[in-house]
């Protein structure tokens, strides 16, 4: 039995589906009164990351835990009570229950010195997990295609508007598809090499956002105009809190060598063209 925490979220659902495809029994942790329904054919454990007793019940009889739990964009949760205290509680409950392996979803940007609170807390939880003496795998994915491309490209392009990019948009990033991260998370449960390791994960290529726009042009068969703004200026259709994050992508490159991980875990990586074609086709359907 494998417990998935965060299973009603986008990434968690994909991980659950991957595990079920492999023929595994899956239990999912669902908050009391949650409106989000988990995938059918899973066992449901009702509980909360701040309820230690419920976590111990959820971990009973489980050999591995995969967690994607993180503070949501809505509601009253905070980084401190979900990402920090909640994950601490989960690690402690898994240890007490004799869980053999815990897979934790962090981020490539995790650092205890980061100016971003979430990235600082992710790094703290990584340290707690390493010091716990539990067998573990830490996943450090790069930025998600599924988050950034719809927000920065599709919101404008699919409505016939110019895509607004920050600066020259020449920095290169190995964006990763959620489905690929889900495949790595599931594979880590069964791969001995994953134990007590940190997997830095990205897509097959480091690309610029201009490259991404070009991929959508190829997928849709028509040009997409681009306009540029200075860092900090408004980006039409994009929430204001994201403007600074979008600008930060123009401050560094984040290539991720993937040959070794791709071969070790048997994951076929999604290219920007693969992703754009699927998104354009879904919109046209």
Language model features with spans:
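Oxidoreductase cofactor-interface core, primarily capturing Rossmann-like NAD(P)-dependent enzymes
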Residues: 1-39, 45-46, 50-53, 57-60, ...
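Glycine-rich NAD(P)-binding loop of the Rossmann-fold in SDR/ketoreductase-type enzymes
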Residues: 50, 81-86
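N-terminal Rossmann-like NAD(P) cofactor-binding module of classical short-chain dehydrogenase/reductase
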Residues: 59, 63-66, 83, 103
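Glycine-rich, N-terminal phosphate-binding loop of Rossmann-like dinucleotide-binding domains
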Residues: 68-69, 106
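Short glycine/proline- and acidic residue-enriched helix-loop micro-motifs
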Residues: 70-74, 259-262
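Conserved active-site and cofactor/substrate-binding residues in soluble primary-metabolism enzymes
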Residues: 85, 176, 207, 267-270
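Short, conserved SAM-binding segment of the class I
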Residues: 86-89, 93
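A hydrophobic C-terminal alpha-helical subdomain
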Residues: 219-220, 231-285
């Amino acid at each position: 039995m494998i417990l998935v925490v965060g299973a009603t979220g986008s990434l968690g659902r994909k991980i659950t589906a991957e595990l079920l495809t492999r023929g595994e029994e899956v239990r999912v942790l669902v908050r009391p009164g949650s409106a989000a329904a988990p995938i059918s054919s899973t066992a449901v454990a009702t509980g909360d990351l701040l309820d230690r007793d419920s976590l111990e019940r959820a971990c009973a009889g489980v050999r591995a835990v995969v967690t994607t739990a993180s503070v949501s964009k809505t509601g009253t949760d905070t980084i401190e009570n979900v990402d920090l205290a909640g994950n601490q509680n989960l690690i402690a409950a898994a240890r007490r229950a004799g869980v053999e392996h815990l897979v934790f979803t962090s981020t490539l940007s995790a650092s205890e010195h980061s100016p971003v609170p979430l990235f600082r807390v992710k790094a703290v939880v990584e340290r707690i997990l390493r010091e716990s003496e539990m067998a573990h795998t830490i996943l450090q994915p790069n930025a998600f295609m599924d988050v950034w491309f719809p927000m920065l490209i599709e919101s404008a392009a699919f409505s016939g508007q110019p895509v607004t990019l920050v600066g020259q948009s020449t920095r290169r990033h190995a964006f990763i598809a959620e489905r690929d991260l889900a495949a790595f998370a599931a594979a880590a449960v069964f791969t001995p090499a994953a134990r007590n390791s940190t997997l830095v994960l990205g897509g097959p290529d480091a690309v610029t956002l201009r490259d991404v726009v070009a991929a959508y042009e190829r997928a849709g068969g028509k040009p997409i105009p681009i306009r540029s703004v200075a860092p900090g200026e408004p980006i039409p259709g994009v929430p204001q809190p994201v403007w600074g994050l979008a600008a930060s992508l123009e401050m560094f490159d984040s290539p991720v060598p993937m040959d070794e991980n791709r071969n070790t875990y048997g994951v076929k990586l999604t290219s920007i063209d693969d992703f754009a074609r699927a998104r354009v086709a879904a919109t046209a359907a």
